[in-house]
From Swiss-Prot:
The keyword Iron is annotated on this UniProt entry: no
Pfam families referenced in this protein's UniProt entry, alphabetically: TPP_enzyme_C, TPP_enzyme_M_2, TPP_enzyme_N
Upper lineage: Bacteria, Pseudomonadati, Pseudomonadota, Gammaproteobacteria, Enterobacterales
Pathway(s): Quinol/quinone metabolism; 1,4-dihydroxy-2-naphthoate biosynthesis; 1,4-dihydroxy-2-naphthoate from chorismate: step 2/7; Quinol/quinone metabolism; menaquinone biosynthesis
Gene (name only): menD
Subunit-level organization: Homodimer.
UniProt-recorded name of the protein: 2-succinyl-5-enolpyruvyl-6-hydroxy-3-cyclohexene-1-carboxylate synthase
UniProt function note: Catalyzes the thiamine diphosphate-dependent decarboxylation of 2-oxoglutarate and the subsequent addition of the resulting succinic semialdehyde-thiamine pyrophosphate anion to isochorismate to yield 2-succinyl-5-enolpyruvyl-6-hydroxy-3-cyclohexene-1-carboxylate (SEPHCHC).
Annotated family: Belongs to the TPP enzyme family. MenD subfamily.
EC number: 2.2.1.9
SS bonds (residue pairs): none
Amino acid sequence: MSVSAFNRRWAAVILEALTRHGVRHVCIAPGSRSTPLTLAAAENPAFIHHTHFDERGLGHLALGLAKVSQQPVAVIVTSGTAVANLYPALIEAGLTGEKLILLTADRPPELIDCGANQAIRQAGMFASHPSQTLSLPRPTQDIPARWLVSTIDNALAMLHAGALHINCPFAEPLYGDMNDTGLVWQQRLGDWWQDEKPWLREARRLASDKQRDWFFWRQKRGVVVAGRMSAEEGKKVAQWAQTLGWPLIGDVLSQTGQPLPCADLWLGNAKAVTELQQAQIVVQLGSSLTGKRLLQWQATCEPEEYWVIDNIEGRLDPAHHRGRRLVAKIADWLEMHPAEKRKPWCVEIPRLAELAWQRVVAQRDTFGEAQLAHRIRDYLPEQGQLFVGNSLVVRLIDALSQLPAGYPVYSNRGASGIDGLLSTAAGVQRASAKSTLAIVGDLSALYDLNALALLRQVSAPFVLIVVNNNGGQIFSLLPTPQSKRERFYLMPQNVHFDHAAAMFNLRYHRPENWEELESVLAGAWRTPATTVIELVVNDTDGAQTLQQLLAQVSHL
């Protein structure tokens, strides 16, 4: 018997089973122990293959692919610390719902805990973070192929959101020519190989029932809070709220068009909070809210009912309101709960939103990161998409901009880390082949600098704006000790990104005013290549501008 040949047949069943559940993208890191999985993926024509030398970036690349494709994405890595590098992307997927299938090669059991090279305890290493965990045995013909394929099918059928970790031990030898070893074992799956359906088909009902008292609540004074959702859902939610006459507080990731812009400014005004206290019901569609003032209001509001609707399971309400947690796709829920045409009940909030917007517009000519956040709408590519980084960048765009309704916006707002942002953006672009604008801070770019390798070959224009404010300036918004702020919080690196772009043969520009930026963008959107644009801004201007605007709007 050829161990290497049967390893490959075992792996081929695993990879073929994944195709029956919509997996098309496979992300592969180099490794020897993962050879059976890698070769099975490489030889399966159903897959689009992506490779990267950095497993942490590879996991985030898969995350970006899953965000756009809305399908599970497989990741193949070798044994040892390569597996541990998938942890950040796995955690993010668990919080934001993208489906990742982590195929981690492992040493066989007899090589664990005995000093063998590159052998760690991989089974269960991700604790409670994967939605599903499957530890496969060492490949053997004593286990029928139908057990293997039905086990994979069962795990994927139970995967509603998040990651499935499949640990796959393989014994040596890992290399060798294919022969008839295991062929009969494989053929016992019959015409499954020619079919397109899973071996084991399971159905799971997820949608919430229609709320029978909706006809009563839709006649009340309500508020709509829109969190993360798809572009199509964002447009529907905006229309739904408008019909009801309810104010819509739209997050930067809501894609609703934010009809009441600058919410994180005007929510700091006591008049707005007082008017919102009249709401009898709050309907939150989508999770992962960004704005600090929005989260503060959410934590203190006490309507008669607070409903949270999202396709992801779990409470999703850090304020623990008394109300309803409804698990459903937002578009489906809206269809089951139609709006009834009513007059708007809020008077003060639209006025405050308009005044706040005017205050922001009055400062748009200054060259700085707060003004970039406000202007970002003007720089979006037609028929394209936006990827927003974390930390100060996303908060400024949320507070100061008004993104168009239905325009695709992506971000990692689950755990809200700055790791893997460039890799995720690369995955977003690869899955859509759309012109993409990504905007991150300098520390975020440094954290994922390896990902520039993923941006060397793109199918559509990709513009990466790095806002270089020389450190983690979000800490300027927090009451960090002044004497220790720079060394222990901001950690300025005093670097520029021209040499990084050159190392990966990417276009690079450092505009010094809006006219230069707009000229660079005009050229970038005409070329299917990556352009790195570094905006060097005064360190604290962005945070200070936000604080000044908050103070102004609070006194309107």
